[in-house]
Amino acid sequence: MIANCVKAGLLCLCALGMSNNSVAQRSGTPIKNIVLVHGAWADGSGWKGVYDILVKDGFRVSIVQEPETSFQDDVAATKRVIAQQDGQCILVAHSYGGAVATEAGTDPSVVGLVYVAAHMPDAGENEADDGKRFPSDLSKSTAIKKTADGFTYLDPAQFHEYFAADLSAEQAAFMARSQVPNFADNFKAVITKPAWRSKPSWMVVATKDRTINPDLERWYATRANSRKVEIAGASHAVYVSRPKEVADVIESAARAILK
């Protein structure tokens, strides 16, 4: 009888060990590659605060510099950086960059998407039309200007008010003067196969966003069943003004999606 108990105990221990091994195999390790995509009227330098935090915490971070000359060029630039990664990655996008990431994120190396005050169109949609669902303060203003060759930019005198109200005047002025003009037709680019339909996603809602209506960001998140994080009082430039909170969301995504 004692022998039978010992055998039973050994069987239980073996079963427990097998169970723990299975869990360990499933648990894996967090994704370490992060690709950051900026939006319209900006460049990659705005990600510096988020970049510093992620790198300090052990992540390998790459920043896409989209030319904004065409939607196809921006998607290609993003895919080019994705291809440089040494494994799976999280794709993070701000503003117009959300549409770019939605199209580029179908790459098999991308295993999750984080939208930061960003557009998130579905197949057959474009961000210009989506923006009409919940018009923003910017869309009702005179701040969007157009060049003779069809590019748009934000009036530097109004940049602080509509894009970066929670930054200092000096920071906003630098962003305004370093902005990359965006080809007007980019906002009308139609999504063919949205990555968020097949991959987990997160949405950072900037509650004081005047460039994209926060209610549109919430609507996008609900439709996509994204994990939603609201950052109270944040402007459209939330990735610049609140880098710690944005980095926390990105790191949460990396921990949630295991290799």
Regions found by a protein language model. Give the residues of each.
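Short beta-strand/loop motif that positions the catalytic acidic residue
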Residues: M203-V205
